[in-house]
Structures are given as C-alpha cells and as structure tokens.
C-alpha cells in the first residue's frame, strides 16, 4: 500500500501558471506560494502516478524537495486515494443582475436622492457598495441616506471620504460601530497615513488614512500589495469574467450610469431611466466577459486571477477583431516574462497612453 501512495494538493489550492513562474493560492489561509514554471508538468502528473513512479520520472532531489515543500506548507497530503480529492468546480454563476456598485457623492442640500438610488441597486441584488464621498463623512449624512433604503441583499459598504481637520478618529469609529455593515472608512487627503484597528470594532472593520487625493484617475493601480485573495468564489469568477467590471454599476453624482467611474461612456441615468433595462443591455455588458486570459501580456501572468483588470486606463496597444481594447492595464509595472516589477509611470512604452489620459 505504501508504494501506491499519491501526493495530492488540496482542492482549495488554486494553481495558475505564467510565462516563467507559477503560483499556488491557498484560498483558505489567504497565502500565495511561488514556484518555477518547470514544476507544472510534475503537478499535472500528481493524480495520475504514485510518488514511487514520479520519483523515477523526475530528478530525485528536485522531486523530494517539492514533496517536502508541499507537505511543510500544508498545501497537500499523502494518500492512497487521490480520487477522494476532486478538483474545484471552476464554473461560476450568480443570480443577481448587479453584484457591486460604486456611487459618487458631492455636497448637497438633501441626500435622500442617494438613498433612492441605492434602493434601486438593492432591488437588482447588489451586495457590495463603495461610496466615493467628495466631502467629509458625517453621521447625519449617512442616516439621511440609509433611512430611504430597505436592504435585502447588502453584505458590505466601503466608504472613501475627504479628510477634515474637524473630524477625529472617534468620529469615524462611531460610524463604524453604529453601522457594522460598513467595513471600512478610508480618509483621503490626510496629512499622515495610518491604519486604525480598534478593539471596539468588528474583526473585519477598518479605519485608515492616506495622503493620496480622492480622484478617479488614481484608480487601477496594480502592485503586489493590492493583489487580494478574496476566496475561491472570487478567483473562480475572475477566471470566467472580467475581474473589475463583471456585474458592476457606477453611478456618478448626477445619476449617470457607467461601467466604472473612470470611464467616459454613459448608458443612461438612474433617476430617469429603468435601471434593469440599462444593465441588461448588451452594450453595457460587453466587457463583463473580457477575461484576463484574453488580455495581452496578462494572459501570460501568474497573478492574472488575483489582479483587478482595469479597462479605464490601459496601454492602448492591442485591440481584438471587435475593436475591444485588450491591452495590459496602464498602471501595472510587472513583467511576467522576466518576473520583475518596475515603476510603470517611467516605462517609455507607456508614455503615449499616459499623455492621452492626462497623467503627466
């Protein structure tokens, strides 16, 4: 029995192969492990051959080091029954018309209209919201908004707000305590950067300050620090759909509906038009299924299913037969062919696009 043992990698480990590297994503522990691409054939053989045969097929030293790595990192186990560890089903489906939305807020005499907009989004199944508030956040404003909404699908709200010298940590913490579905408040334009975690908050709630201005042009940055692991479902969605725009609606301050706040095209107005008709329109959904496997350069990147695929700002260097921009996101400095990160803004090949978007 011993010589028929197999090394199996756990089903919640998602493996992605790039041009020269591969990664093993542990979705349960939110960890990423890198390996040379040369191990990909070995990994593909694991369920087909017992370890005794694999040791003969591959270099003894490398094979034993690989087995030790998998077991030490708790990424797999030895078993005589590999059939008991089926692969994760990578098909994705969700019933809601809209899953996530971004709403812009500006100073107003009345904030009730924002609540009415949120209700329309909730009616279409929206679960996740980002409030981009171009004003200092206040309890009275949120109360005015939320009193107009009966949430049936809400899971979380993240708030981006302008800094105010009149507001202290406690002002924001009071809001987080009162509304546990608000998972984070990010204060933009702060003189200092800080990440506040208070014991009185729920485990998944955060308050943080950043110096950066609250500007749509600051969106779409790709770096190691913002490659988030959101669980198996999110990665599976990213495999089959666009990781940024799938089932997303952006509503600007005037009620105009877009795929993303940074994009120019408007598809209608949430205050004047039927929201379902807009989001169910083929033209609105045309980018929803533009996956990373179709994006130039990204298709060869090991991080492609962890990355948010920005379509608002791209290198503008590659288009498909239908005219869709399939260029790499402008603000990514990673080269999957060398495995190295570099500053994107100084790349000579990106200067034309940088000038076009007015980011000089």
Predicted feature residues:
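Acidic, low-complexity/disordered tracts enriched in E/D and polar residues
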Residues: 1-46
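A C-terminal junction/extension of Radical SAM enzymes
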Residues: 2-7, 181-260, 306-309
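Long, charge-rich, low-complexity alpha-helical segments
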Residues: 31-129, 143, 147, 184, ...
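Concave beta-strand-loop units of leucine-rich repeat
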Residues: 105-107, 133-135, 159-162, 187-191
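C-terminal accessory region of radical SAM enzymes
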Residues: 209-228, 262-302, 308
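Local cysteine-cluster metal-coordination motifs and their immediate loop/turn environment
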Residues: 294-315, 330-337
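Short linker/helix segments within small regulatory modules
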Residues: 316-327
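Short Fe-S-cluster ligation motifs
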Residues: 326-360
């Amino acid at each position: 029995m011993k010589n028929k043992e197999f090394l199996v990698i756990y089903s919640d480990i998602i493996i992605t192969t790039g041009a020269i590297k591969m990664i093993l994503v542990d979705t349960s522990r939110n960890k990423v492990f890198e390996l040379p691409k040369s191990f990909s054939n070995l990994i593909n053989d694991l369920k087909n051959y017992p370890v005794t045969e694999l040791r003969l097929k591959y270099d003894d030293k490398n094979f034993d080091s690989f087995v030790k790595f998998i077991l030490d990192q708790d990424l797999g186990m030895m078993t005589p029954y590999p059939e008991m560890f089926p692969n994760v089903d990578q098909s994705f489906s969700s019933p809601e018309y809209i899953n996530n939305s971004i709403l812009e807020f500006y100073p107003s005499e009345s904030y009730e209209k924002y609540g009415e907009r949120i209700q329309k989004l909730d009616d279409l199944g929206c679960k996740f919201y980002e409030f981009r508030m171009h004003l200092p956040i206040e309890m009275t404003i949120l109360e005015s908004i939320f009193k107009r909404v009966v949430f049936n699908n809400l899971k979380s709200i993240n708030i981006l707000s302008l800094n105010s010298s009149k507001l202290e940590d406690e002002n924001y913490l009071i809001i987080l305590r009162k509304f546990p579905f608000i998972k984070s408040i990010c204060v933009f334009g702060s003189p200092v950067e800080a990440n506040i975690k208070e014991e009185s908050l729920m485990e998944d709630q955060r308050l943080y300050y950043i110096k950066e201005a609250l500007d749509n042009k600051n969106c779409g940055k790709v770096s190691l620090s913002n490659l988030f692991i959101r669980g198996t479902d999110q990665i599976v969605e990213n495999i089959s759909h666009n990781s940024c725009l799938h089932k997303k609606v952006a509503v600007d301050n005037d009620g105009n509906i877009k795929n993303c706040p940074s994009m120019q095209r408007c598809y209608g107005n949430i205050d004047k038009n039927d929201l379902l008709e807009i989001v169910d329109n083929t033209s609105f959904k045309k980018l929803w299924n533009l996956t990373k496997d179709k994006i130039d350069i990204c298709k060869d990147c090991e991080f492609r299913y962890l990355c948010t695929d920005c379509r608002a700002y791209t290198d503008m260097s590659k288009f498909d037969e239908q005219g869709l921009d399939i260029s790499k996101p402008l603000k990514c400095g990673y080269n999957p062919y060398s495995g190295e990160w570099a500053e994107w803004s100084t790349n000579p090949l990106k200067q034309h696009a940088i000038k076009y978007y007015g980011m000089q």
